[in-house]
Each structure stands twice: as structure tokens, then as C-alpha cells.
Amino acid sequence: SDIVTKIFQMLFEIDSSIYKNHTSIGIKLEDLKERPKKTIPAICSWLGIEEEESLYEMTAQGKKWWGDPTSPDYTVDGMNPFGKTSINRKVGLVFSKNDQFILRTLFYPFSVRFGYAKENPDQFKTDLKKIRPMLDQMFDFEKNIAAKTRVDMAEFMKSGYYLYLRSGLIERWTTLSKFNTYPNMLKPLRIK
């Protein structure tokens, strides 16, 4: 499933050993969408390049880019480089409150570093302990997929996608349990 791959990749791409020895930054989509006139100059400065007007346009090699037609936002503002549909999407569209709790806990260090959450180490440690047994169970979004595809839950739990996601979730949990963070986590771009 595409969603499983995206979760797995995100959990690992925010914490790569390449960030430890190379100069790398992360840029919040919200900063780019809501404050392009501050964010793009900050990116240019960090990269050591000149700010150009074309950076504010949806172009690729000088040609107009019409957006990704596979995006759920394509018909709304998919052709607007600074459209806000993607950052204003209703929470809960895919993940239940239970799913969100687990993912929010696993992404906690990233969320704190990038300013999405306030630091609360004691609550984080409590939540981390609480989610460990939950990682061995199906997420609600997985139950929905199984129901829609008419796959028996026991069979679903033997599937490659289920086992792949679990291996990543448990590895990330183990790292957080040991370090209380991701040791090689990406740092955010500082915008003045």
C-alpha cells in the first residue's frame, strides 16, 4: 500500500546518518506556502544562490508546470505554487485518533524540533511506553483497507505491507526508547 510506504519512508528519512556529516536542512511546507517571500530568500541564502522571480512560479526548465494531476488537491489549487489546500486538509481523513496518537508519538522529536509540538519529555516517555504494545496490533487505517479489499484480518497481518510497516515502527520505537530522540535528525531551516 502506498500509505504504508510513505509512513515508513517518513519515519526513516527524518533521521538519516547522512545528516550527521553533511550540511542538510528541512523546510516546513507551511513556511513555503504561507510565507514564500521570507522562506525562498532564506533557502537561497542557505544554498548560496541568487533569488530569482522564477522561484515563485510553477515552472520546470522554463516551462509552465500545471501541477500533479494525481494530487488530491489538483482540482482545487494544484496549479498554484502557494495554494494552501494541502496544509489545511482536515485532520482525521485517513488516520483515526488512535492511529494519530501512535504516529504523533513516533514523530514527537521531529515535531518538537520543527515547532509543531511543545517539548514535554515526561509525557513523551509515558506515551512511548503506552504505544509499544499497540505497534503489534493493526492500525485503524489498516482495518479499513482490509475491510475494503475483503481480506481477512489474520491474513492481512501476514501480508508483506503489514510486516514491513511493523519492522519500521518497532525499529523507530527502539531508537526512541534508547535515545529519547532520533540521533541524526534533520534540522529545520531558520527563517528570519
Regions found by a protein language model. Give the residues of each.
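PAPS-dependent sulfotransferases, especially Golgi type II membrane carbohydrate sulfotransferases
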Residues: 49-192
